[in-house]
Amino acid sequence: MSRAALLVLADGRFPAGGHAHSGGAEAAVKAGRITGAESLEAFCRGRLHTSGLVTAALAAAAALGVDPAALDEAADARTPSPALRAAARRLGRQMMRAARATWPHPELDVLARRFPKGAHQPVVLGLTARAAGLGPDDAAYCSAYEAVSGPATATVRLLSLDPFDATAVLARLAPDLDRVARAAAEAADRAAAEGVDALPAASAPLLEIGAEAHAAWPVRLFAS
């Protein structure tokens, strides 16, 4: 295993399509819930401990070898918004393309055939980590970081927020990232022993509501 593979996978320039999605930040900016660095930090912390925990646990479980089809079904059950489910599958399809080109692996091929329109992104992320020789802890960290880095980067574009301030927000969230990644990896261990019902099912209703409203906008900067 090369831990450097984690740097490649977590790099915002990895061609997995995440740059086109705001993680709910665009809807939150329009609603006035994100107005600057302080409110961005609150938004990211809330997202991290809810949907971020869910996706990190799914990714960790996939990296651990839990059945990806069962994990995909679990992801559907934990994503009430049709718009978010569709976005997760689009991102999963794009990540699959990047993963198969970067770390070819039979398990990726099997998942791609089973879900030709895309499996949920965290499931693909976890299986990609597995293909790269990484472990469930690595997958959990990568997914948890995506949960906050996406909105932070999007807010720089949406509000012309100083990139230094956005990066400082991410740095202040580091202890939360540690806690969420650790909880996600522990949940993945339970899922391997007890089944996917052992995975967390934390919810963030405003993210779901905002995603549905955002999907209906005639003009928007981000896909979700």
Residues of each region from the PLM?
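Glycine/small-residue-rich interface belts in oligomeric ring/scaffold proteins
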Residues: S2, L6-A69
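Short glycine-/small-residue-rich flexible loop motifs, especially phosphate/cofactor-binding loops
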Residues: A25-E26, G126, T153
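Internal, conserved structured core segments that host functional sites
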Residues: A56, A61-L134
